[in-house]
C-alpha cells in the first residue's frame, strides 16, 4: 500500500512539474506581443507548389527549344 501511494505521489509530482513548464512556455510565447502566423500545410498548397515547379520546368524547356530552332543550332 505504501509503495502504491509513493508511486502515485511521484506520478502526481512529475505531472504537475511538466504542466507547470508547459504553462510557462505558453505564457512566454504570449508575452511577445506579436501574433505568430502559422504556415498552412495542406494538400492543396503542396499540389499548387508542385504544379508551379512543373510549369517552370516545362516553360524553360519550351524556351530552350524555341531558341534552338530560331538560331538553327539544333
Curated annotation (Swiss-Prot):
Q: A single GO CC term, please?
A: extracellular region
InterPro entries (alphabetical)? Antimicrobial_frog_2 (IPR012521), Frog_antimicrobial_propeptide (IPR004275)
Ordered alphabetically, the record's keywords are:
Amphibian defense peptide, Antibiotic, Antimicrobial, Cleavage on pair of basic residues, Disulfide bond, Secreted, Signal
| Keyword Signal set for record | yes
Transmembrane annotation, as ranges: none
Q: Where in the cell is it found?
A: Secreted
Q: Which GO terms describe its biological process?
A: defense response to bacterium
Q: Does this entry carry the keyword Secreted?
A: yes
Cysteines joined through disulfide linkages:
68-74
The pro-peptide lies at 23-41
According to the lineage, what is the superkingdom?
Eukaryota
Leader peptide range in chain numbering: 1-22
Expression by tissue: Expressed by the skin glands.
Described by its record, this protein's role is as follows: Antimicrobial peptide.
Query: Which family does the UniProt entry place this protein in?
Result: Belongs to the frog skin active peptide (FSAP) family. Brevinin subfamily.
Q: What is this protein called?
A: Brevinin-2Ta
